[in-house]
Regions:
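Acidic-and-aromatic substrate-binding clefts and catalytic sites of carbohydrate-active enzymes
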Residues: 45-49, 83-85, 142
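Short, acidic loop-to-helix structural element flanking the phosphoryl-transfer center
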Residues: 79-106, 147
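A metal-dependent, Asp-based hydrolase signature
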Residues: 29, 34, 43-79, 97
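Conserved phosphate-coupling serine/threonine residues in phosphotransfer and NTP-handling enzymes
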Residues: 109
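An amphipathic alpha-helix signature
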Residues: 17-26, 50-58, 113, 117
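Active-site neighborhood of HAD-like aspartate-dependent phosphohydrolases
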Residues: 1-38
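Hydrophobic "anchor" residues on beta-strands that sit immediately upstream
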Residues: 1-3, 106, 164, 210
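Asp-based, Mg2+/Mn2+-dependent phosphohydrolase catalytic module
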Residues: 96, 112-226
Length: 226
């Protein structure tokens, strides 16, 4: 069974962030506070999400105090908006190939239930994996720093002979699947755009057993379930 991380593995998390930027910028323009292009320039030129929201909120407060478009409102919009994101071609290529081979797939992801569910729906991932094999920390109560989500996946799929986890973040993606005897594969951030830097200066127990630079490369790996 092949189990995936979601953010910065099956798609780039920056795309979700940019999607929220567009929603916020359109609202600023709709209210006549800032043009869409000006709002997007402020958001995209301010580093990470928190910095971007803070920058735009200050600008809006100076132009339209009390309008309600606060930093808190922007963070909530980021978390709850319907994302305009699509599954990258290489992700779709891999998922379709695994599906055609009859390989069972799953997802273990950290985040709020509504946020992650919105991403999963937008990316069309339900067509590749059973609902019982989509585990979200906001629903299970355990993130990937814990044994539980990986053990839960094994418990739900006792007929599987082996498990592989494909992720991007060595800080938490691989330590527990390694401990449970899974294969572990890191999708390397060759563009340097991931939300979490891939710091490999860690104990061996945290590191993946294999690195790939693109998801379709997984098809060339000698894994018993592929």
């Amino acid at each position: 069974m092949v189990v995936f991380d979601l953010d910065d593995t099956l798609y780039k998390e920056r795309d979700f962030l940019t999607s929220s930027f567009r929603v916020i910028a359109r609202e600023a323009e709709r209210r006549g506070i800032l043009s869409y292009s000006k709002a997007m320039a402020l958001l995209c030129g301010s580093g990470d999400g928190a910095g971007a929201f803070s920058t735009l909120a200050r600008e809006i407060a100076s132009r339209a105090p009390g309008c309600g478009m606060t930093e808190e409102w922007m963070v909530n919009t980021y978390r709850t908006h319907t994302p305009d994101v699509t599954l990258p071609q290489e992700s779709e290529q891999l998922l379709e190939a695994l599906k055609s081979k009859g390989v069972r797939m799953g997802l273990i992801t950290d985040g709020r239930s509504n946020t992650q569910r919105a991403k999963i729906k937008a990316l069309g991932l339900e067509s590749f994996m059973e609902p019982r094999n989509i585990l979200i920390s906001g629903e299970t109560g355990f993130d990937k720093n814990n044994r539980e989500p990986f053990a839960m996946m094994m418990e739900r799929n006792q007929d599987e002979k082996g498990f592989v986890y494909v992720g991007d973040n060595p800080a938490k993606d691989f330590v527990w699947p390694n401990a449970l005897g899974w294969g572990t594969v890191q999708l390397d951030d060759t563009e340097g755009v991931n939300i979490h830097p891939q710091d490999m200066d860690r104990p061996a127990s945290f590191l993946p057993r294999l690195h790939i630079s693109s998801l379709p490369q997984l098809l060339a790996v000698d894994l018993p379930m592929i």
